[in-house]
């Protein structure tokens, strides 16, 4: 995965100006992530845009609850995440919508707690709620997603950090 390096706070030659705008502030990059992964069953996702938001070394971590109640983590790079979710998105509508956000920033580093609800369509009931823990770094005039870790609410696990 190659990313052009912009100069002087403007997109590099040939970069998509809208994608560049997605990376200029924290709420916008988070909204763009949700837009990239949401859509009706079978609809193509904007994986080129999704890749653009991610640092080349970005990782995602999904928590999994096994049938016996034990948990484990599944870690993905960008391409393995896309490969993992594509069959699900082909068969099932998935709309993840942010319902709350908390940003903590120090210098060029930011952490975002982003609470979400997921539905199969925008008109159907919520199928799950949870939280994304997103780590960002500002370099080369833009924000980059370095890691996203998430878990879903379930019996005994409710988001109560604020």
Language-model features, listed with the residues they occupy:
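A short, hydrophobic secondary-structure junction motif
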Residues: 28-29, 33, 52-64, 80-87, ...
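Short beta-strand edge/turn micro-motifs at domain boundaries
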Residues: 2, 129-159
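Surface-exposed, charged secondary-structure patches
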Residues: 59-123
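Short, hydrophobic secondary-structure boundary micro-motifs
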Residues: 46, 61-63, 146
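Short, low-complexity N-terminal intrinsically disordered segments enriched in polar/charged residues
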Residues: 1-52, 56
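Short, surface-exposed coil-to-beta transition loops
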Residues: 96-99, 127-133
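Short beta-strand segments enriched in hydrophobic/aromatic residues
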Residues: 37, 54, 116-118, 149-152
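A short, polar/proline- and glycine-enriched secondary-structure boundary/capping micro-motif
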Residues: 71-73, 122-126, 154-162
């Amino acid at each position: 995965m190659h990313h052009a390096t912009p100069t002087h706070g403007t997109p590099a030659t040939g970069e998509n100006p809208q994608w560049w705008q997605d990376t200029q502030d924290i709420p916008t990059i988070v909204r763009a992530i949700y837009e990239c992964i949401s859509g009706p069953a079978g609809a193509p996702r904007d994986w080129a845009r999704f890749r653009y938001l991610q640092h080349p070394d970005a990782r995602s971590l999904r928590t999994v609850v096994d049938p016996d109640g034990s948990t484990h983590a599944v870690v993905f790079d960008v391409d393995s995440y896309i490969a993992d979710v594509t069959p699900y998105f082909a068969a099932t509508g998935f709309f993840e919508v942010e319902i709350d956000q908390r940003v903590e920033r120090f210098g060029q580093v930011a952490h975002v707690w982003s609470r979400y609800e997921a539905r199969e369509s925008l008109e159907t009931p919520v199928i799950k709620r949870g939280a994304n823990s997103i780590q960002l770094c500002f370099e080369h005039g833009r924000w980059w997603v370095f890691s996203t870790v998430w878990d879903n609410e379930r019996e005994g696990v409710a988001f109560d950090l604020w």
